[in-house]
Amino acid sequence: MSRVPSPPPPAEMSSGPVAESWCYTQIKVVKFSYMWTINNFSFCREEMGEVIKSSTFSSGANDKLKWCLRVNPKGLDEESKDYLSLYLLLVSCPKSEVRAKFKFSILNAKGEETKAMESQRAYRFVQGKDWGFKKFIRRDFLLDEANGLLPDDKLTLFCEVSVVQDSVNISGQNTMNMVKVPECRLSDELGGLWENSRFTDCCLCVAGQEFQAHKAILAARSPVFSAMFEHEMEESKKNRVEIKDVEPDVFKEMMCFIYTGKASNLDKMADDLLAAADKYALERLKVMCEEALCSNLSVENAAEILILADLHSADQLKTQAVDFINYHASDVMETSGWKSMVVSHPHLVAEAYRSLASAQCPFLGPPRKRLKQS
């Protein structure tokens, strides 16, 4: 009977991460063998389909599974009449079923295994069920004395059986010192400073509303704020900054980005937020707005987005808008936005025409390239 091996130490199981707890599953397999010798084999007069059975055998005295070998000396049926058929039969079983693999071979005059055949998987046995090989070996080859498979007219069959038994789980806790590094919460913590107005040292005034902020954070994130506070400007002396041309809700979203690197409402105000990001040199936020606007390009708004991109030097957005217009040229040129742009921004109309004229091949579909973020 196979022995359940001790599991390897958890640290040796893998060169990858080490878990706090582990489980090692061992599938128990009982292996045993059986040898069956048939004397005077050449005198077997059984007809096709007739059977010779061995005595029963098991893995040991306490094993209630009983097996036997079954031979059809002249084959099982018409298809195998020129062969010896060999099967493993489950004679008795206290369980509803068992699974087992098996290997058959013939021992030659030297006691060596020859003509071995093995099951490719563990088969399901129930009591009275057999599995094996209908064409185990050709009769003419077996009976040919030159092949030495019937010394003294004895056929010796050797069978190895592997019976699958229950699985065993061994589990435990890792004894190694585990150091758990907490996730970085810098974004949330800085966002908390903004939301709670703690330890502020400057005031930002937007359309009559006042917002408390931190000069160091503003200066670190925005070159424009940095210039305000670094030089002897009025904003630096009074610690008060007047924010113009930005609506309060857009300003709050911009400040959320400055403190956390996130802008959860960006899709709702991408156009206005693009203008604010451009004004305060927030390059990553600017490209995030460009990407959001690109994903919402349509025939109706293509001209307006092209104007917006040109106004705020949003080069990637501008390229995407021009490409979109080229692809949908006939439809876009019928919109009120395009007709208005012809009057207000003729240079953009010229750029769009130049791009259309220089196109070497038609577009396969509307451009939706992912933008590069700073």
Curated annotation (Swiss-Prot):
Its main location: nucleus. Disulfide bonds: none annotated. One of its GO terms (biological process) is regulation of proteolysis. Residues 297-355 are annotated as: Homodimerization. SMART domains: BTB, MATH. Residues 31-161 form the MATH domain. GO terms for molecular function: ubiquitin protein ligase binding. InterPro entries: BACK_BPM_SPOP, BTB/POZ_dom, MATH/TRAF_dom, SKP1/BTB/POZ_sf, SPOP_C, TRAF-like. Residues 173-297 form the BTB domain. It comes from the Eukaryota. Keywords: Nucleus, Ubl conjugation pathway. Pathway: Protein modification; protein ubiquitination. Coiled coil: none annotated. It is found in: Nucleus; Nucleus speckle. Component of a cullin-RING-based BCR (BTB-CUL3-RBX1) E3 ubiquitin-protein ligase complex that mediates the ubiquitination of target proteins, leading most often to their proteasomal degradation. Belongs to the Tdpoz family. Homodimer. Part of cullin-RING-based BCR (BTB-CUL3-RBX1) E3 ubiquitin-protein ligase complexes that contain CUL3 and SPOP, plus a target protein. The BTB (POZ) domain mediates dimerization and interaction with CUL3. This is Speckle-type POZ protein B. It comes from Xenopus laevis (African clawed frog).
